[in-house]
């Protein structure tokens, strides 16, 4: 396979994600309509050159060297396609804030995989890209919906293969995501979790996840209320989020059906009917303000098409 000509450009648009949704720890996630955009250009030079150009002052978490997630993902494509690495420039327009529990690292991984693959006319299948994305991230709950879109449940089968189920999300259920002006790294959020949990907590979570998925499919408010809670990770993580429990209580009191930490946090996801959305959003922002934390709480629709790419031009 030939290396693409210098000047070839590919645009990749990758949605943010909210993972876990309460009981779906490390297996459930949904794509949201907040996006990072990446433009990849084949430039002069060898595979040790990777230029990263940011178009956001909030993008300093993405580094431009070989340790960068975009570059690491591109390298995986080259390795699996048996291609000699070549120089790439990635121009990134960031809208997904880093370290907020909205899958910013997943957007970098997915963009690197899709961009490097597309610029070579896609030698790797989408299934292979999914496998590589999960391998790089270490868990599937963000990268799978980021690549495929929608609400995705991903689990290892008895044969140790990853199985992905696209789950239904009823149109009447809306998402409000309260995004604070504070950061929390995934590694920090994982450190506080115990290595073992009581079997009763695991059983409770399995039941809650079943209720939640059926509630989201049918738009059944009662099932969502009864299913959107967690025993495996949230009891240990709330203490890391300043004012988080107060924000959750405010959302529920304002009419939210359920409330959960988005991914590793600190953002908080609330599900509600459309008529309650404005009150829920305002209540969450106000509760964080009372704790001395600035925030915003936009409506974010579930994005169903996943990551998209297009060729911009040649030289």
From Swiss-Prot:
Functional pathway: Amino-acid biosynthesis; L-threonine biosynthesis; L-threonine from L-aspartate: step 4/5
Any single Gene Ontology cellular-component annotation: cytoplasm
EC number: 2.7.1.39
Predominant localisation class: cytoplasm
Gene3D superfamilies: 3.30.230.10, GHMP kinase, C-terminal domain
Gene Ontology biological-process annotations: threonine biosynthetic process
GO MF term list: ATP binding; homoserine kinase activity
Any single Pfam family the record assigns to this protein: GHMP_kinases_N
UniProt entry tagged with the keyword 4Fe-4S: no
Residues that, per the record, bind ATP: 97-107
SUPFAM superfamilies assigned: GHMP Kinase, C-terminal domain (SSF55060), Ribosomal protein S5 domain 2-like (SSF54211)
UniProtKB keywords: Amino-acid biosynthesis, ATP-binding, Cytoplasm, Kinase, Nucleotide-binding, Threonine biosynthesis, Transferase
Statement: the UniProt record of this protein carries the keyword Amino-acid biosynthesis: yes
Compartments, record wording: Cytoplasm
Reactions accelerated catalytically: L-homoserine + ATP = O-phospho-L-homoserine + ADP + H(+)
Described purpose of this protein according to its UniProt entry: Catalyzes the ATP-dependent phosphorylation of L-homoserine to L-homoserine phosphate.
NCBIfam families: PRK01212.1-4, thrB
Family affiliation: Belongs to the GHMP kinase family. Homoserine kinase subfamily.
Protein name stated in the entry: Homoserine kinase
């Amino acid at each position: 396979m030939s290396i693409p000509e210098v000047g070839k450009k590919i645009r990749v648009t990758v949605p943010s994600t909210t993972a876990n949704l309460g009981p779906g720890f490390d297996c459930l996630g949904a794509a949201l309509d907040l996006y990072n955009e990446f433009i990849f250009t084949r430039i002069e030079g060898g595979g040790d050159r990777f230029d990263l150009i940011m178009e956001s002052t909030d993008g300093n978490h993405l580094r431009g060297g070989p340790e960068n997630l975009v570059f690491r993902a591109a390298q995986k494509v080259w390795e699996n396609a048996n291609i000699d690495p070549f120089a790439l420039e990635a121009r990134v327009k960031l809208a997904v804030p880093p370290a907020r529990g909205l899958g910013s690292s997943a957007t970098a991984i997915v963009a690197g995989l899709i961009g490097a693959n597309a610029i070579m006319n896609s030698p790797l299948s989408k299934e292979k890209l999914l496998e590589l994305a999960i391998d790089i991230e270490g868990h599937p709950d963000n990268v799978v919906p980021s690549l495929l879109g929608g609400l995705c449940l991903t689990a290892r089968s008895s044969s140790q293969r990853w199985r992905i189920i696209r789950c239904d999300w009823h149109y009447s259920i809306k998402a409000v995501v309260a995004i604070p002006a504070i950061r929390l790294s995934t590694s920090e959020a994982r450190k506080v979790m115990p290595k073992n949990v009581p079997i009763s907590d695991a059983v409770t979570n399995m039941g809650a996840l079943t209720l939640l998925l059926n509630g989201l499919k049918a738009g059944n408010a009662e099932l969502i209320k009864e299913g959107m809670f967690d025993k495996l990770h949230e009891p240990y993580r709330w203490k890391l989020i300043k004012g988080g429990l107060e924000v959750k209580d405010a959302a529920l009191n304002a009419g939210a059906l359920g409330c959960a930490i988005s991914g590793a946090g600190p953002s908080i996801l609330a599900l509600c009917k459309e008529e309650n959305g404005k009150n829920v959003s305002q209540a969450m922002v106000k509760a964080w303000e009372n704790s001395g934390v600035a925030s915003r709480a936009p409506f974010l629709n579930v994005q169903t098409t996943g990551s998209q790419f297009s060729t911009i031009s040649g030289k």
